[in-house]
Amino acid sequence: MGGYLWSSQKEPENYNYPIDPALKEKAYALENEFISKYCSPLTLKELHYKDIPIDYHGDCYLHTLIRGEEDLLKPNHNNKKILIMIHGYQASAFIYFRLIPLISDEFIVICPDLIGMGFSSRPKIQFTSTDQTIDVFVECIEKLRQKLNIEKFYICGHSLGGYFALIYAMKYPQYVENKIVLFSPTGIGNPKKGGNSTENLSFGQRVTYVWTMGLLFYIQPTTQSLSKKYVLGNMIKSGEDDKFQITKEENDILGQIRRMHFEYPPDLETCIYYIYQHPLPTPIKPLEDLIEEKIPDKDIIFIFGENDWMDKFGTVRLNQKDGNKYKYYIIPNCGHRWPIEKVQEGAKIINENL
């Protein structure tokens, strides 16, 4: 496994980009407005964001969406289970705005914006290797657990968040409950063993994706405005033709929040250079290989959209090798972003399995 699951990377020197207080205040007000209007039946008291300071890279914090903070602070968390959900690349916890209200009331739900993404701190970190890059995100999840005094929790993750979630569970199995849920995870299959993570893309989508990923790998870090406002936006939109059932009002506020993510200081978008092989989204360290080397003593539940462009083949192949020990669900008539597109079906699977 390259050793990184059992070694601690040296923390980089302390430096964080300053964030404009006025921009931060405006962003947080928009988030509160959205939660108040569109996360019914939850209220702002029940579901809200909080900046959680973590002991990493100086004065860093994770901007974290929490349902049930009052229970979290009570002894034994008021006998409730804890679920931490990790978002994917260039996203934020808001991808779960429809899912959170549908999760069983048995759970306290915690959804951090990953370090360097969303409205979390923007540290200046120079990525140098795949191991070090993965470790940055995994260690920040662990720092969050420590700060919130959580002894054990269930972990879920969407897309790249699923990749980090599983690696976290392999590195810190003592803190993770016996079930892990991965939402359309990236980085599963080893293409040398069969399967292709672009199998479900149309020809036009493949051309666009290859072009976009190729450009991302050649642009310099100084071209932040180009990569953020055009290249990354184009990649996210062209990944698939999802038909989100979002109202115009919801979309307007979400669009404003998204644009504010791009107005924040430089983020950690360059992590993909060390996680994926150029130019296609094939992992440098496939989870298929990592799991084969060290089979987690956990039940893993995989959930994909029927038209998902993530590699379902690696999951099927892995499951066959391990005697079909993992659960595997396909949500019909949706793509990669089913937490927005087919949230009722996804919530049902989660509630039945955890």
Predicted segments — roles?
Residues 6-16, 134, 138, 175-322:
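Flexible "cap/lid" subdomain of the alpha/beta-hydrolase fold that forms the substrate-access gate
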